[in-house]
Amino acid sequence: MTRYALAIAFASSVLTSYAVRPAAPDRPTVKRIFREARVTRGNTNILKVQPIDDASWLWLPGDSGMMQLGERKLGSHSNNGGLMNPIFLKFRNEFEVKEGDGKLVIDVSADERYFLTCDGTFVSRGPNRSTVENWQYNTYEIDGLKPGRHILEATVWRIGDKSPLAQLSWRGGFILKANEAYDERLTTGVAKWKVGKLSGIEPAGADDGAWGTGSQWKITGSGIVVAEPSAWTDAEVVRAVAGQRGPHIYGARTKGWMLFPSQIPDQTENSVTPGRVVAATHEAGWRANHVYTEAETKAPEVKAFNDFLAGKTTRFTVPARTKLQLAWDLGRYICAYPEVDLGAAKGARFSWNWTEASHRGTDYLKGGEPGARDAIIGRYLGGFGDTFIPDAAKGGTFTTPWFRCGKWCRLDIETGDEPLHILDISLTESRYPLEMESAFASKDDASLADIRRISARAMQMCCHEMLFDCPFYEQQMYPGDTRVQLNVISAMSRDDRMIKRAIELYDLGTRDDGQCPFNWPTRGAQEGATYTLCYLLMYGDYAMNHADRAWLRARLPGLRKSMSGMELYENADGLLENLPGWSFMDWVVGWDWDGTAPGGRFGEGVNAEANLLWVLAMKSAALTERALGHELQARYWDEKREKLAAKIVETFWCAERGLFASTPKKRDFSEHAQCLALLGDVLPADKAEVCFRHLISDDDLKRCTVYFSYYLFETYFKFGRGDLFLKRLDLWRDYVKKGLTTTQESPDWTDEKGGQHESRSDCHAWGAHPIWFMQTGLAGIRSAAPFFVKVRVAPCPGNLTELRAKHPHPQGFIEVDLKFDSGKASGMVKTPVPGTFVFGGQSIPLVVGENAIR
């Protein structure tokens, strides 16, 4: 365990909203506190509305903390870097604690990010990503401070255009507010804080990293967290206290950060050393891709390093004048801060690269054969990462400003005239504390457990301070992904805080015409109306599956703005036409490379898939309005939806084929259009049956891939065909066979010329939705009324003869234990709310508690 990890371990093994972090003897304990949620701007920065408004923001004198003239401005998506030099600062306050002072309570934030300790004990890192108008701060209670001298210390950095694309910023700053007993000693702007600049930290190429995840780093000296400035000076106030007390008749807002208390728990801080080193070589160049041989899997350094990882030895030594490359299989996908403790060694350097998979040395592909993700012989490890150069006299403890991710690590080590002692190495796993609280099992299909395992891991790896499409690329929220992810979270856990946060962030980012950002938060904005439609579906999902009416009511202006904005793009017939931006639908083999359905681009006219999503958005809006008591608004969307449905049938329905075409020319047909039409109830029942029959039998339809299979599976279960769902899971079964520990972005495929194409990403949580369907489809547990006050259990088990499931509910869990035989069900349903059980002609009322099914 590194010196840096040791500080964290003293503080916590897993950070949660309810547990005090255990401390070592004579060290303080830290407890997260949640300030009352505020969902509107209100008087923020006009009046003092919270304790932190009495604190000032600090920075280093002489540094503007802002983008300089001639630099690439925030908002550019180019990858050519900028002129801004990242700055890393350390703020310090030495203070005295007296008898009777009691617990210390602090509110803390920074721009861009901070790492905070008290007497060397880890307190927190943050803040959670957001917009300047919704800047986040956290609150902590620090207990056990004995009389005497203590130190609060924060490492704060502003990377600017070399930070991940999702990192927004106003200017550099640090703010901390202490409770009354400690106010004069600790509150920034009241107490004296020292600040110093840390040296030896510089970006090292590819400043957007792996497609938007930030710079790689070259760090020389002692490391970001433990390094000391060469000189200290008094920190200066760069923005004074926000707002004023009492009435403010002019309503003027203080510029800059508008602070809101974070409502999501801290990220996990688990120190781990997973997996094992599987190959070692002295033949690779510095940070060079090297194809490993079988002999290199048996090199003596393999066993020696694995003994070191297992704690059997206290150090791993690389001799003087040596080049060594190690291939480390982490065993499963992980998001973590790398941590390594290096001894003093003049001329030594240590590189730590991360990648999702090994690549074959012959064709550079990851491969789809069984066990491909675990293979190393004949393969190389690429990826991206960081270089650490220890102080020649003192060594150093190294980590990175932001987490790294993947299933594989490649360590490149080079020494000069002195040996390098690696004193410790570990990972601090970082993610939202989302755990699998639900359950599903059937002895009839063992593969379902494996599919749940990789789906859950994918969801965990894409859930952090905000949701990600994927952790290796972009690290941004995309509404199409997010809508699916939110329902996966609903199926995994009763915790709805990330669900609310995601919808909130999109609401904060909508444009003046109601369009939701295609990717958000971001400095490199994209537009796409089809994803605005996906954003609108999240409201109805929340209204049905969760219970916070007050929160949903506060978000209603966002729903209404975007719904009204979509109406601006209707033509004279009421159809959406010439939508702005990228009308992405799915990565479909046979469509153009950009994933847009035929007729979906600007200037191409009208398209069925986009208009059918608009139908679903109207259903979602009507449901949400009605759930909140706005019947007039709900009827407006119901009536408008009926008119749109009729026009869609008139324009796109091909009676000869019993299918919806993608365009009025009726030459292109997709599973996507049929699914959306059937889910939107645009056809009468008899024609819907015809459409469904052709959906499952016509082999020339363009097929849904990983993401859009969500809508396909919803359609299967709407028509009671759990057997089709189980069959279509073969793609996920192949993931397991390949050795994947998460779900991919898209299927691998071969083009008409025999060229092989692979999924870009090995971890995309839009493919985690089988978890949702096992519980809501196979087990059939669904909300039957807004805010989940009623349940409908209507299992569609396919060929399963028995199943057991546990599904989250705002008041607990709904559990089923069922057997199926000759079209009859038997077993048990336990529920915290009343409802109905439906199967094979049976319709049984469910009461609160345990219900026998016979």
Located regions from the model:
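Catalytic-core region of carbohydrate-active enzymes that cleave or remodel glycosidic bonds
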Residues: 708-738
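Solvent-exposed loop and edge beta-strand segments that line ligand/cofactor-binding
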Residues: 80, 327-330, 398-399, 467-479, ...
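Active-site acid/base region of carbohydrate-active enzymes
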Residues: 182-195, 408, 416-454, 460, ...
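Helix-terminus loop motifs that line ligand-binding clefts
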Residues: 125-130, 357-380, 493-596, 730-754
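Alpha-helical support elements that line or immediately flank enzyme active sites
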Residues: 140, 337-356, 409-414, 475, ...
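Extracellular/oxidizing-compartment recognition motifs
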Residues: 21-469, 481, 497-498, 516-521, ...
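Bacterial N-terminal signal peptides
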Residues: 5-17
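Non-catalytic C-terminal accessory modules of carbohydrate-active enzymes
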Residues: 210-211, 216-221, 639, 726-854
